Amino acid sequence: MPTIQQLVRKGRQDKVEKTKTPALKGSPQRRGVCTRVYTTTPKKPNSALRKVARVRLNSGIEVTAYIPGVGHNLQEHSIVLVRGGRVKDLPGVRYKIVRGALDTQGVRNRKQARSRYGAKKEKG
């Protein structure tokens, strides 16, 4: 434990908070360009083909982002909006693509949780 004199000289050092989404540089979302769209397998015990994309953000950083929902229209050179949010069973995937924004279409025939997937309200 420091003495009072040591505290007068140096003071206490603030703890540095570590961000979970460093590539966003403090922004809620960032725009980026898809450099590669592919599928990958989750870690044990899950089994699937998860849709992900390599995205070069306008901050200059390249990240791996998850494409949520059923089906998508993304390909190389698509402009996407990326938000934070990890995918627990995909190591290294700490970002998600926002559905219904920029070049990304919303999920078709979505009835519940529509705002998360950029789906418009159906008529009738």
From Swiss-Prot:
Biological process annotations from GO: translation
Listed InterPro entries: NA-bd_OB-fold, Ribosomal_uS12, Ribosomal_uS12_bac
Post-translational modification 3-methylthioaspartic acid, affected residues: D89
Keyword Ribosomal protein: yes
Cellular component, GO, one term: small ribosomal subunit
Keywords recorded for this protein, A-Z: Methylation, Ribonucleoprotein, Ribosomal protein, RNA-binding, rRNA-binding, tRNA-binding
A Pfam family that the UniProt record links to this protein: Ribosom_S12_S23
Keyword Magnesium in annotation: no
Bias-annotated ranges (Basic and acidic residues): 11-20
Region: Disordered, residue numbers: 1-32
Superkingdom, taxonomy of origin: Bacteria
MF term (GO), any: rRNA binding
Family: Belongs to the universal ribosomal protein uS12 family.
HAMAP family for the chain: Ribosomal_uS12_B
Record-linked PANTHER family: 30S RIBOSOMAL PROTEIN S12 FAMILY MEMBER (PTHR11652)
Subunit structure: Part of the 30S ribosomal subunit. Contacts proteins S8 and S17. May interact with IF1 in the 30S initiation complex.
Function: With S4 and S5 plays an important role in translational accuracy. Interacts with and stabilizes bases of the 16S rRNA that are involved in tRNA selection in the A site and with the mRNA backbone. Located at the interface of the 30S and 50S subunits, it traverses the body of the 30S subunit contacting proteins on the other side and probably holding the rRNA structure together. The combined cluster of proteins S8, S12 and S17 appears to hold together the shoulder and platform of the 30S subunit.
Protein name: Small ribosomal subunit protein uS12
Organism: Frankia alni (strain DSM 45986 / CECT 9034 / ACN14a)
